[in-house]
UniProtKB/Swiss-Prot annotation:
Compartment(s): Plastid, Chloroplast
Any one Gene Ontology molecular-function term assigned to this protein's record: structural constituent of ribosome
Main location: plastid
Organism from which the protein derives: Glycine max (Soybean)
Gene3D superfamilies per the UniProt record, alphabetical: Ribosomal protein L33
Gene Ontology BP, a term: translation
Family: Belongs to the bacterial ribosomal protein bL33 family.
Name assigned to this protein: Large ribosomal subunit protein bL33c
Any matching Pfam family: Ribosomal_L33
Entry keywords, A to Z: Chloroplast, Plastid, Ribonucleoprotein, Ribosomal protein
Length: 66
């Protein structure tokens, strides 16, 4: 049995470019990815460059709260 909190946690990454873009236009949604991270190796918020189908380019996806 595992003790305490799990080391690996599920996090949600959200596109930072879609937020700024959808202010003037109708909301087309926000690109989100689900991944896991190791709490011991990366205690801070995770930021990765991923492809955003809404922006049609690679943008920074940042971790959000659940």
């Amino acid at each position: 049995m595992a003790k305490g909190k799990d080391i690996r946690v599920i996090v949600i990454l959200e596109c930072t470019g879609c937020d700024k873009k959808s202010v003037n236009k109708e909301s087309t949604g926000i690109s989100r990815y689900i991944t896991k991270k190791n709490r011991q190796n990366t205690p801070s918020r995770l930021e990765l460059r991923k492809f955003c189908p809404r922006c049609c380019k690679h943008t920074i996806h940042a971790e959000i709260k659940k």
